[in-house]
Amino acid sequence: EVVYDDESMAGYMKAAVGVTPDRPILIDRFLNHAMECEADAISDGTHAFVPAVMEHIELAGVHSGDSACILPSVHISEENLETIKEYTRKIAEEMHVKGLMNMQYAIEDDKVYVLEANPRASRTVPLVSKVCNVRMVPLVTQIITSELTGKPSPVPELKEQAIPYYGVKEAAFPFNMFQEVDPVLGPEMRSTGEVLGLSKSYGEAFYKAQEG
């Protein structure tokens, strides 16, 4: 729930149910007009590799599953891209993640904020694997089974590659089937699927995703 003033906050608190010391209400400051982005990482517990950063088209506040995103990023500065990759690597290494990890960020006034660190596979893994030509799942399987197979971690050998086209992920919504669902997007996920548009043109990739 996003509230914008004291009156809305008071109304929400009155309507909240099941609030106990063990089930508190968590409050975060909302970043106004912030750009949201995310990054997936492959980590072996010591080293981490970030193939690319995905830029959300909708502003922060829309659930990442409902937001369209573009890969590689179009509007994020090189400095912020490097910051995001560095944060992702350091957090994965500090948490000793062995496998996949997804990080979500917001950028407000040219400052990068960490929103979430999820040490698990994300729905964006197929997108990143396809667009970046990185076989993320087989690589992670090799990491997880390394103690059984004796094979070394592939992470130190992974290098970021130039992406020759754009990939746009767009969410698929069930509003035509469930007409009672509020179509206004927010922090609660409403999509039931997604599609990918590919093109050497950002605009055409977005168009293909909309058509899909």
Give the residues covered by each predicted segment.
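ATP-dependent carboxylate activation and anion-phosphoryl transfer catalytic cores
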Residues: 1-212
